[in-house]
Amino acid sequence: MNYKLFSPYTIKDVTLKNRIVMSPMCMYSSKNEDGQITNFHLIHYGTRAAGQVGLVMIEATAVLPEGRISNKDLGIWDDSLIEGLHKATTFIHDNGAKAAIQLAHAGRKAELETDALAPSAIPFNETMKMPIEMSKHQIKDTVLAFQQAAVRSKQAGFDVIEIHGAHGYLINEFLSPLTNKRTDEYGGSPENRYRFLREIIESINEVWNGPLFVRISANDYHPDGLTVQDYVQYTKWMKEQGVDLIDCSSGAVVPARIDVYPGYQVQYAKHIKEHANIATGAVGLITTGAQAEQILNNNEADLIFIGRELLRNPYFSRIAANELGFELEEPYQYERAPGKISTNK
């Protein structure tokens, strides 16, 4: 029997062998605080590739040193960082998966000794520092940094780029009226609040012709914040600009209580897919093969982003295949261990 979860998926000229994506998750493991890939990262990402994930996405990687969430984040702000990232893509490719990178700037959530930057001088909460409102010059420099990061991503051998526009980081801060109180062309109307992301996408398109994803927070979980319907318009603009897929997460732009349950964010992937007519990725407490297969069969999303479940078990793909009764092609090195495996939950 054929299963959609294990069917190929082609975006532009890149074909994923299945619909399982390793969701980007910060490991805070650049131990020398220089943004460099370490041996841990090679093992971490390579193991998930060997575990038969279709697309392995490297964690949020800062386009500027001051754009890191922490000083142990990965970086792509300098050519000296390309070599390490190329080792990672080679490791991933050699183990049978495609490689993606998430380009990011933490904005007001940067927990560094340097000043935090944001569209407006509003802290995330009472314990975090007051950010500095970005000047237009700083905005232009950041747009350029995303473009230069895309060039380095290409040189490092990545197949897919994802722009991190979610979770209350810099791009999300520009999009949301809760965090963007500017009165210039970068604030006010939805068109103006989208301008920063528009310029980033335009700049990346000048140097990158591969698949381009954007991760969004499709709900601010605040009465005065953005809802998934607001993001329908944003994603229509993204599609017009050539974005290929929307990775649908939610929350974290402001402190909020969120009702979390299995597949709680799938509704956003479905809504965006249906109303913006664009491919989507579903993420959030997707933990079994049956659950993932149902999402795809219901046409609620095109790709399944797996996060914590892949931290618990890097061989999630094999377990999902066994659960569904699908014969997954194994690395030849593992052929001596046939039969079912389980997580023993």
Curated annotation (Swiss-Prot):
It comes from the Bacteria. It comes from Bacillus cereus (strain AH187). Gene3D superfamilies: Aldolase class I. It catalyses: A + NADPH + H(+) = AH2 + NADP(+). One of its GO terms (molecular function) is FMN binding. The lineage of its organism: Bacteria, Bacillati, Bacillota, Bacilli, Bacillales. The gene is namA. Keywords: Detoxification, Flavoprotein, FMN, NADP, Oxidoreductase. Its cofactor is FMN. This is NADPH dehydrogenase.
